[in-house]
């Protein structure tokens, strides 16, 4: 769905050591392991939302290879991506897959890599949603809203989104856990409708 995702992920914070003594006290090999595993969980969660051929900018404020180069290699091999090189001037003093090291650049330090998701951009096929099949929209609810709206059933409640955004909402709901989309209208109660608070 997205052409570009920037994932500035939570990390062990080695780039914060000079200005935050608590970051030094909190650092441990166990915390580094916790961080690189959490980072992979985050990346796996956002990856389906990146279009084939789309770009991922992956960044941390730490320097160890577990959270930096190893995760970039994991993205390339496990999720399917090409690591891109960004031409930079030698006097910028940026190393490897773009380590911005304190003492060489302004700031406390950072790591960055750019990857292109495998595949060629194409139309997205919307997967059918899990749960109850959509019922035909109740005509009574059409009288509750003005304008051109698309109605859909989600968690036993009818929702409405502007018709011009219906395909985008359906696409997002097919690959992400969308908590809220549009306006919840009502929940069926027998032959009646219980209006939602969002109205």
Residue ranges and their predicted role:
Residues 50-52:
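Helix-to-beta-strand junctions that scaffold the AdoMet/dcAdoMet cofactor pocket
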Residues 13-16, 64-68, 91, 107-109, ...:
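Flexible loop/turn segments at secondary-structure boundaries
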Residues 56-57:
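A short hydrophobic/small-residue beta-strand
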Residues 30, 69-89:
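Conserved Class I S-adenosyl-L-methionine
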Residues 108-111, 118-199:
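Polybasic, low-complexity RNA-engagement segments
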Residues 83-109:
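Class I S-adenosyl-L-methionine
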Residues 7-44, 61-68:
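Mobile active-site "lid"/loop adjacent to the S-adenosyl-L-methionine
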Residues 1-6:
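A short acidic, Gly/Pro-enriched loop at the edge of an enzyme's catalytic core
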């Amino acid at each position: 769905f997205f052409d570009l995702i920037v994932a500035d992920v939570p990390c062990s914070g080695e780039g914060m050591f000079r200005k935050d003594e608590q970051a030094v006290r909190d650092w441990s090999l166990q915390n580094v392991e916790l961080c690189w595993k959490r980072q992979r969980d985050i990346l796996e969660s956002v990856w389906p939302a990146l279009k084939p051929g789309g770009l991922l900018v992956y960044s941390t404020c730490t320097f160890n290879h577990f959270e930096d180069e190893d995760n970039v290699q994991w993205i390339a091999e496990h999720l399917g991506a090409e690591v891109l090189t960004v031409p930079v001037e030698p006097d910028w003093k940026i190393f490897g897959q773009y380590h911005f090291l304190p003492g060489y650049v302004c700031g406390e330090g950072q790591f960055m890599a750019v990857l292109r998701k495998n595949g060629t951009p194409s139309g997205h096929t919307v997967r059918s949603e899990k749960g109850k099949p959509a019922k035909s929209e109740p005509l009574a609810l059409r009288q509750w809203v003005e304008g051109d709206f698309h109605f859909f059933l989600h968690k036993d409640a009818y929702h409405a989104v502007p018709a011009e955004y219906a395909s985008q909402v359906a696409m997002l709901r097919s690959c992400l856990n969308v908590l809220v989309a549009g306006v919840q209208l009502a929940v069926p109660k027998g032959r009646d409708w219980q209006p939602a608070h969002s109205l």
